[in-house]
Amino acid sequence: MSKQSSSGRRAGVAPLAHDRPALTHRVTLDDIARASGLSIATVSRALGGSPRVAAPTREKIEKVAEQLGYRANVAASLLASARPQILGLVCSLQQELHVRYRAEALRYAEDRGFRVIVESIDASRDVDRAWESVLQLRAQAVIAVDSTCISTRFTNTPTVLIGQRAPRRDIDLVTSANELGMGQAIALLVRRGSRRIAFLEGPPGPSARARKAAFTQACRAHGVDALTVAGGDNVDAGFLAIRAGVPAGVDALVCYNDQCAHGAILALLGDGLIPGRDMLVVGCDNSAIASSRALSLTSIDRAPARVASLAVDQAIARALGDDDRPSRRSVDTELVVRASTG
């Protein structure tokens, strides 16, 4: 039988977290190496996912690391890696659709073994600073959600745009085709009796122009009046657009996005009008707002999971150098019908 130490432990086995006083410093690879009786190099390879480490050894090291409360320094690992599997994602998290793209891109990239560094632009953080941040963490390619998230400084970085029109020929583009979903929306409104339909426009840019063009084309195809009203991409914009007044006789609204539609509905309710009865309302993006019981908004779904997966696939191909030819991918949109259209 093996000798026992005075404390009841077997000789030659390093104490683990439950046997020793809690460490007061950040747990390091050296701590794990001493506790497991292995070299620092082996520990580093195991925790870094190297295939050179046998499964039983990896499991032992991971168990020791967990017992010691080890937390990897992710930033240091990313900076030290010879060829890190990292993508950047630049978006505006004030927009519901961008939030959805972010979630889908993170999930899909993780399945492919890549990390995604996310930066959001807003009034206090411009697009160049956002790009600089993801590139400092060695993103090998960047996905931009909307052309407003494209940097004009970092033009040598492989770039994939989720949007309507690429500002440069070397940028990969994944777009949601507006025509099918918008055509379905106008067809539904016409079946429900609408004859004068107003489009609450979005902020200036390729996305707003593409949605407006699809709206006008669909109205023309169905022989109904297509009117436009200044709107925007947030709740206040939709609310103020309705308060400012819509053209006489308008019996249905198609809004640039769901947030704009949300504001329009609040204004209609404030005026004593019932959405789905007194005014039919359609949004775009099929966000969580649209699907909520509180709003139940008919909306055009942009297939964000499919769009994000295509963008991630192309970004990975560019990051690995597998494909240096800019691609153009398109995904159809589809109408999701709810109570706001009767």
For the regions a language model picked out, list residue spans one by one.
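Alpha-helical recognition/docking segments in bacterial nutrient-uptake
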Residues: 1-3, 24, 85-187
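An alpha-beta-alpha
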Residues: 185-228, 327-341
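Short beta-strand elements in bilobed, periplasmic/extracellular small-molecule ligand-binding domains
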Residues: 109-121, 198-199, 216-236
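Periplasmic-binding protein-like
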Residues: 88, 134, 138-146, 198-201, ...
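Short beta-strand segments enriched in small/hydrophobic residues
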Residues: 35, 40-44, 79-94, 188, ...
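Hydrophobic alpha-helical segments within soluble ligand-binding/sensing domains
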Residues: 172-199, 209, 235-243, 261, ...
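N-terminal helix-turn-helix DNA-binding module of bacterial transcription factors
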Residues: 1-82
